């Protein structure tokens, strides 16, 4: 094919800085000149026509042209110097998909693969909800995460170990081992376009696994469950991230990415909720306690211990009043130093007063008389 010897712009006969209109004009002229209907039986003309269409497709597409201008033909093919890996490297399914058994083929058939730098696979984020009390006290727990690892049955080869490699792997029945398929479609009356595309049956490899591994089904990796020790420092903020380098899914031909565990609070414990380093809760008291005072109350903290709040006689609590108790909030974790400090945030208690639904009888009468008797004093409060 001409692509091996000429650049896309040389094929169309345009300059390096050709505009879109110049490219379209050259394309129209060349397709008329090299159209197979005008050159019956001329294989060179047919190949030239295919190359002209391919060159036009690249140069008329902004993204492909950007890659071509930056990296040339090798960039389009994903070879060294381009933005992607070559055929059979990366993720399965696309033009830049990884070759799930490329090294097997090379070992069998003597191929020499390009020595690209190993790319990293994607990282995995795992959100885990823990009790607020665990953020307060700190601690550790074991987390089980399903991950993909090199298949233990076929040792990552992809084929059934009962068979030898040369018997387990065959030429692709769809593309005949070429790794490509020629797709033809009509672009205008009397004009047909042929596109040479990587075969989707073998992902452009030209070979397929005939006898696949019963465990991984030819994927070379299989799912297993691994245990990870999660350590939570006291006072760790919500959204605290714990990383495990190179422990994400193993992908053939790539370096495994990271597992990132993100900690979130499952909900309030002992009635507490959190905002940064401070804790919040609501407490209900009676009308008598609100008006007369002279009481003590123990409130359970997130570590199971208790703190005491109290009111002296005659100290009134208003509905909705919020009380701040210093140094009773969350332990303060220093993200920069990566350790828990001795300082604590504050605890905030919002007081709710429980009023009776209705007053009646002697109680209503006596209370009314009391207010009338001390009406002036209430006005002065």
From Swiss-Prot:
Region (Disordered): 72-93
GO terms under cellular component: cytoplasm; endoplasmic reticulum lumen
ZnF (CR-type) intervals: 138-225
GO biological process, one term: protein transport
Keyword Transport: yes
Motif Prevents secretion from ER mapped to chain: 378-381
Residue ranges occupied by any J domain in the UniProt entry: 5-74
Extent of Gly residues compositional bias: 78-93
PROSITE patterns per UniProt: DNAJ_1, DNAJ_2, ZF_CR
Subcellular location: Endoplasmic reticulum
CDD domains: DnaJ (cd06257), DnaJ_C (cd10747), DnaJ_zf (cd10719)
GO MF: Hsp70 protein binding; protein-folding chaperone binding; unfolded protein binding; zinc ion binding
Keywords assigned by UniProt, alphabetized: Chaperone, Endoplasmic reticulum, Metal-binding, Protein transport, Repeat, Transport, Zinc, Zinc-finger
Sequence ranges of the CXXCXGXG motif repeats: 151-158, 172-179, 199-206, 213-220
Matches recorded under PANTHER family: DNAJ-LIKE-2, ISOFORM A-RELATED
Name this protein carries in UniProt: DnaJ-related protein spj1
Organism whose genome encodes this protein: Schizosaccharomyces pombe (strain 972 / ATCC 24843) (Fission yeast)
Lineage: Eukaryota, Fungi, Dikarya, Ascomycota, Taphrinomycotina
Gene name, Swiss-Prot/TrEMBL: spj1
């Amino acid at each position: 094919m001409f692509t091996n010897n000429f650049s896309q712009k040389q094929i169309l006969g345009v300059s390096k800085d050709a505009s879109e209109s110049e490219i379209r004009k050259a394309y129209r002229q060349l397709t008329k000149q090299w159209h197979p209907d005008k050159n019956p039986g001329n294989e060179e003309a047919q190949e030239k026509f295919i190359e002209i269409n391919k060159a036009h497709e690249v140069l008329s597409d902004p993204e492909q042209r950007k890659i071509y201008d930056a990296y040339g033909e090798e960039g389009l093919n994903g070879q060294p110097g381009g933005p992607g890996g070559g055929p059979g490297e990366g993720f399965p399914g696309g033009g830049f998909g990884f070759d799930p058994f490329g090294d097997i083929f090379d070992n069998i058939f003597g191929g020499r693969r390009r020595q690209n730098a190993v790319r990293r696979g994607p990282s995995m984020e795992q959100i885990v909800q823990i009790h607020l009390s665990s953020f307060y006290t700190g601690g550790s727990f074991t987390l089980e995460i399903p991950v993909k690892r090199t298949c233990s049955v076929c040792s990552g080869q992809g084929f059934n170990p009962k068979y030898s490699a040369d018997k387990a792997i065959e030429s692709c029945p769809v593309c005949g081992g070429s790794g490509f398929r020629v797709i033809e479609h009509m672009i205008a009356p009397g004009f047909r376009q042929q596109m040479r595309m990587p075969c989707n049956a073998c992902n452009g490899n030209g070979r397929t696994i005939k006898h696949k591994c019963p465990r991984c089904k030819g994927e070379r990796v299989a799912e297993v469950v691994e245990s990870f020790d999660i350590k939570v420092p006291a006072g760790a903020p919500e959204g605290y991230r714990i990383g495990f380098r190179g422990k994400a899914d193993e992908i053939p031909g790539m370096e495994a990415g990271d597992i990132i565990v993100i900690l979130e609070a499952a909900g309030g414990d002992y009635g507490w909720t959190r905002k940064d380093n401070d804790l919040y809760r609501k407490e209900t008291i009676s009308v008598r306690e609100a008006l007369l005072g002279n009481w003590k109350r123990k409130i359970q903290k997130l570590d199971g211990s208790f703190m005491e709040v109290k009111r002296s006689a005659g100290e009134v609590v208003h509905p909705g009043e919020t009380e701040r108790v210093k140094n009773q909030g969350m332990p303060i974790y220093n993200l920069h130093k990566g350790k828990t400090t001795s300082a604590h945030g504050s605890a905030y208690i919002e007081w709710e007063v429980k009023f009776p639904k209705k007053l009646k009888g002697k109680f209503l009468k006596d209370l009314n008389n009391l207010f009338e008797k001390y009406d002036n004093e209430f006005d002065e409060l």
